[in-house]
C-alpha cells in the first residue's frame, strides 16, 4: 500500500494554512519554497485540493489559497481522497471464476453469489483505515505540532509567511 508524495505535500501545506496568525492567503510558490518542494508538482496537488472543495483560490496581487472549512472539519481522509481519488485500494478481478477445473458455463452459487473472501478482508481493512483517517483532522494535527514544535520555530514560521520582504 502506498500513497503518493502528493498526500504528504498536501498535509504539510494545509497544516501551515491552519495557522490563524498568518493573516493572508497562501501562495503556492511560498509554500513550495518554504518546504523545498517543486512548485509545479505542488500546483497539481493544489488543483486537486481545490477541485475537492478543501481549498479556494483568492485572485489578485495578494491572492493565493485559503481553506474552505475550519481545520476541525477537514480530515486526513478528505485529503487522501482529494489527492488519490476514492477507488478502493484492492481491486478484485474474481480470478477464482477462472480456475481450470471449473465449468464456466455452470458456475455454482459459491462462485457467483458469494463474495470473494479475500476481497471481503481487504475491503474491511481499508474501511478500518478510512475510519482512522476520518478521525484525524487538520485541527488535531495543528495541536500535535504545536505541542512538539519549539515556540521560537513556530514564531519564525509565522514571520516567514507574513513578511515576504524579510526573506
Task: Report the location of each language-model feature.
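Alpha-helical residues within the helix-turn-helix
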Residues: 33, 50-51
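Short, hydrophobic-biased segments on the C-terminal half of alpha helices
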Residues: 46-47
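Beta-hairpin "wing" of winged helix-turn-helix
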Residues: 53-62, 66-68
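C-terminal regulatory/oligomerization modules of transcriptional regulators
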Residues: 92-167
Amino acid at each position: 500500500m502506498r500513497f503518493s508524495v502528493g498526500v504528504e505535500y498536501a498535509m504539510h501545506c494545509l497544516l501551515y494554512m491552519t495557522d490563524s496568525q498568518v493573516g493572508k492567503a497562501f501562495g503556492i510558490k511560498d509554500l513550495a519554497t518554504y518546504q523545498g518542494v517543486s512548485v509545479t508538482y505542488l500546483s497539481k496537488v493544489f488543483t486537486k485540493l481545490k477541485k475537492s472543495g478543501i481549498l479556494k483560490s483568492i485572485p489578485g496581487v495578494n491572492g493565493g489559497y485559503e481553506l474552505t472549512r475550519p481545520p476541525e472539519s477537514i480530515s486526513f481522509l478528505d485529503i487522501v481522497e482529494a489527492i488519490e481519488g476514492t477507488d478502493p485500494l484492492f481491486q478484485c478481478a474474481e480470478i477464482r471464476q477462472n480456475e481450470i477445473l471449473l465449468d464456466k458455463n455452470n458456475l455454482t452459487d459459491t462462485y457467483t453469489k458469494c463474495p470473494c473472501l479475500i476481497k471481503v478482508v481487504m475491503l474491511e481493512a481499508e474501511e478500518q483505515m478510512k475510519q482512522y483517517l476520518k478521525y484525524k483532522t487538520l485541527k488535531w494535527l495543528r495541536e500535535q505540532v504545536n505541542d512538539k514544535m519549539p515556540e521560537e520555530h513556530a514564531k519564525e514560521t509565522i514571520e516567514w509567511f507574513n513578511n515576504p520582504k524579510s526573506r
